[in-house]
Swiss-Prot record:
EC number per UniProt: 4.2.1.59
HAMAP family: FabZ (MF_00406)
Subcellular location(s) per record: Cytoplasm
Enzyme class, broadest EC rank: lyase
UniProt KW Lipid biosynthesis keyword: yes
Domain of life: Bacteria
Protein's name according to its UniProt entry: 3-hydroxyacyl-[acyl-carrier-protein] dehydratase FabZ
């Protein structure tokens, strides 16, 4: 058997391997997908991602965040609206990864059935799971979101979004 010359290629398997599906995202990768920046980028990393379906993100809550200066000085609590925004940003990762929607800007179109079940304080790690329920005309959709701390439900609700040009 002769060795292949520099112009010959060794035989390869005709079947190609599908591209690897990314299931986690670092902070740097999130910044390439979402337009938010400090102090309004509220997702530190994505620890689990199922394309077109759901994402699980982490927010490490620290006393250094600017909202704790006034909410509240003697008893810092993460504002509920920021918990909802953090869940929406995790949902944004799901949306920006949908085929033909890469680079789209998604904004709130509505919020339903949001309930806060537990306080979120500095030192907590917020684990947010956001699942895409439906999308219509590739412009409007709804997601179910949950935020937990130490396995305890902190907030939940339905988030509606719209794609703007």
């Amino acid at each position: 058997m002769k060795a292949p010359t520099s112009t010959e290629q060794p035989a390869t398997n005709e079947a190609t391997t599908p591209p690897e599906i990314k299931t986690t995202f670092t902070s740097e990768e999130i910044q390439k997908l979402l337009p938010h920046r400090y102090p309004f980028l509220l997702v530190d990393k994505i620890i689990d991602y199922t394309p077109g379906k759901q994402a699980v993100g982490i927010k490490n809550v620290t006393i250094n965040e600017p909202h704790f200066t006034g909410h509240f000085p003697d008893r810092p609590l993460m504002p509920g609206v920021l918990i909802v925004e953090a869940m929406a940003q995790v949902g944004g990762i799901v949306m920006t990864q949908l085929p033909n929607l890469e680079g789209g800007l998604f904004v709130f179109a509505g919020i339903d059935k949001v309930r806060f079940r537990r306080q979120v304080v500095p030192g907590d790690q917020l684990v947010m799971t956001v699942e895409l329920l439906w999308i219509k005309q590739r412009r409007f959709g709804k997601m179910q979101a949950r935020a937990e701390v130490d396995g305890q439900l902190a907030a939940e609700g339905e988030l509606m979004f719209s794609l703007i040009n």
